[in-house]
Amino acid sequence: MSILLQIRDITKRFGGLQALTRVSFDLSQGEILGLIGPNGAGKTTLFNTINGVYRPDEGRIIFRGQDITGKKPYHLAKMGMARTHQIVRPLNDLTVRENVMVGACFGHENRSLHQAREIADQVLAFVGLEGRADQLAGSLNVAQKKRLEMARALAARPHLLLLDEVLAGLNPAEIDGMVQTILKIREQGITILMIEHVMKAIMNVSDRIIVLDYGQLIAAGTPQEIAHNQRVIEAYLGDPRIAEQLMEEQVYHERSGNP
């Protein structure tokens, strides 16, 4: 399996605050890689550094064999990188279809409106919003706005999709539906790096998981390995709810006979 994304010794500072310290990992083509960590661990900062919102102070980012360190988001969109955002902000006064057409054109200036509309309709059907295409985006509920955010990113036809807490604020049925959509995205050949706090979901959907704490990579491995990792559990002890979820995962894997 070929390497799609290489993160090498990424360090990011904001004044006297060191948000990331020498973070390194690889992401293989077709993989779903989960990124977890306590609040304030540096997860979204890492996303913003990967997709060009921030330039790292040190380190290199290699995407599809090219050094993209410091490149702007629209350049990366043209190369095949797209992302969603933790706080969903659709263009409320545009229709759902028009929002997705914007995503289809970002970084792809040569696409015609006709092409953008065709892509938008295909993607809306894929995420289950085809019946909402002519509604104003501002009229959607939270779960629908999450799907719209994902549709805008998919409309760019990415090789790599960065998902920032797409499950936050969803009920259990909506989470299950979104997880199925994420798996369908991978079936399309799209590689996924996702930040998530819904532990059971990310444990079930990820091939591997990496863990940040205070801006440092403290663990990497399969979901089973992460659920058993004492350092990861200790990092989450400041959030008893998530620490409990991790320990529940550990008990589940022990009872099921998984390593």
Predicted regions span which residues?
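Glycine-rich phosphate-binding loops of nucleotide-dependent enzymes
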Residues: 2-259
